């Protein structure tokens, strides 16, 4: 089940709560020069529509390990809970990662050029800026390790 809140990860953002906006609705020819940006825009758009009703800056959480026959991304791990958000960082944003104790977590930042600028593993507060990530929007993708055979561990990781 996917919901909009989780105590494990919080993004505090001082930004506009809008959707992707395009000045011209005319089709853009995709070619070798713009393919990476176009493919990333397509992936971001699919995520926004499928999980958060088109809303930027809204977390989506997959609260159970992904079944083998229903994976939104190729090769999702069976021992992992996933969370993600598309964040408008044009005016700055902050990622706050709480202490997860011994539990493995990773938070990957993917920019609009499909470049992974950073992967965070430690608790802390991190500024998400265009100087560092080079695009107005990024996907923050979080992974939390669980024992998928233990419902109690899944519940513990998901609170």
Predicted regions and their residues:
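Bacterial N-terminal signal peptides
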Residues: 10-18
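Bacterial N-terminal signal peptides that target proteins for export
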Residues: 1-9
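N-terminal export/targeting leaders of redox proteins
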Residues: 2-3, 17-25
């Amino acid at each position: 089940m996917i919901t909009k809140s989780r105590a494990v990860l919080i993004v505090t953002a001082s930004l506009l709560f809008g959707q992707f906006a395009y000045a011209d609705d005319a089709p853009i020819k995709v070619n070798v020069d713009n393919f990476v940006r176009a493919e990333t825009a397509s992936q971001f758009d699919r995520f926004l529509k499928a999980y958060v009703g088109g809303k930027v800056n809204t977390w989506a959480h997959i609260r159970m390990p992904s079944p083998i026959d229903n994976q939104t991304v190729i090769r999702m791990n069976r021992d992992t809970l996933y969370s993600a958000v598309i964040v408008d960082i044009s005016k700055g944003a902050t990622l706050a990662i709480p202490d997860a104790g011994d539990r493995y977590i990773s938070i990957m930042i993917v920019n609009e050029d499909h470049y992974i600028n950073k992967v965070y593993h430690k608790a802390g507060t991190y500024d998400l800026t265009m100087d560092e990530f080079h695009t107005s929007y990024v996907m923050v993708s979080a992974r939390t390790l669980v024992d998928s055979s233990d419902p109690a561990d899944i519940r513990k990781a998901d609170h």
